Amino acid sequence: SARQMSAFRGMAEEFTTLRKLLATNTDIPVANTLKSLLESGNNAALYDLYRFRSALSACRSLGWQIGTCAWNDQLLSETLSRAQTGKRHILQLNSTRDTFSTTGRMLRPVAFSLIHPASLESSEVEDIFRDEGFILAHGRECSLNGSGRNMLSRILHVGHSGLPKAEWGIDHSNHL
C-alpha cells in the first residue's frame, strides 16, 4: 500500500482525510488529488516543520496526548494537571511560531516536557524524532508522585545539527 512508500511516510492523517472526502463527494478528481499528495510527500522531507508535525502525529497515533503550555508561569500547574490523569503527555514548552520560520525552517530547538507513568519508557518519542532526522538533548527530569500515581516529567529538546549552539540554551555537547 502507499503507506509503506517512503514518500508517503507520516501522512496517515492526510490519507484518512482523503478517504472521508472521497466517501462524501465522488465528483473529486482523484488523480489530481493523489498527484498533489505525492508532491507534498516528496517536499515534506525538505522542510523541518513538516517532519516535526509528522513526528508529533506519529506520537499521537501511539497514544501520546499533545498539548502546549501557553505561559511559562503555568508550567507547574499544566504539568501537575496532566500528571494526575496517569496518561502519557507531550507538553510543548515553546511556541511553534517562535521555533520555526514562516517557510518551515527550524530556527531554534523545540522544548517538550514528556509526562508519563514512571513504569513506561518515553524512548519511543525520542526514536520517532530521530527517525525524522532531528537530534535530541535531555534537560531535567523529576518525579511526580501526587494522587497515588508515580509519574515522571522529562524535558526533551528537539532540534537539528545546523542550529547555533547558543540557541539550545543547554549543554549541547551531549546529544542523544
Task: Name these PLM-found stretches.
Residues 105-176:
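Acidic, proline/glycine-rich low-complexity IDRs
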Residues 1-85, 159-176:
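Intrinsic disorder/low-complexity detector
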Residues 68-108:
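An N-terminal amphipathic alpha-helical segment
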Residues 30-38, 100-114:
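Short, conserved helix/loop micro-motifs enriched in His/Cys and acidic residues
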